[in-house]
Amino acid sequence: RVLRDAGFDMDLDGADSFSIQYQNANNSVRVSDEFMQAVVDDADWSLVGVVTGQVIKTMKARDMWRQIAEAAWECADPGLQFDSTINRWHTAATTDRINGSNPCSEYMHIDNSACNLASINLLKYLDADGTFDVDAYRHTVEVVFTAQEILVGRADYPTEPIAENSRRFRQLGLGYANLGALLM
């Protein structure tokens, strides 16, 4: 309501909506070693349709790299995923290649897999005197990680292949939130 009352066009096809439609998206571009070499060599690079495999457009790799860099500088997107490196460092390389990630790219694995993610709010461990309660934090890590491990076996997944791979590989991700606020 506030934006509408301030005169913004709230129509879904309106100019104002168009300018913010991707603000909550997290976009990445996946590049290979061959693409990076084409950037160095200022060579042509073909954009290929994922479904059809047909060349859609050919352009200078260096020009595309500049567009990616400028877009990232302007709005922090796209992120970059280095496909060749990702698959070289694959922790289950004998299974299949890694084709994608979750939106924030902290989880990369084979198709039809999932990672149970959780975060711990670091500010909850900041005592009144400004010290960090390491013992309580360690205890929380142990409890949450154990809970995540239990959840893998008890969770429902959208498809049977995702359920099978989740239970087979048991990927877990435990992170933290509010590091910046904690340090301030």
Residue spans of the language-model regions?
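Active-site cavity-forming subdomains of large catalytic enzyme subunits
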Residues: 1-139, 153-165
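Generic alpha-helical secondary structure signal
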Residues: 112, 116-117, 139, 143-146, ...
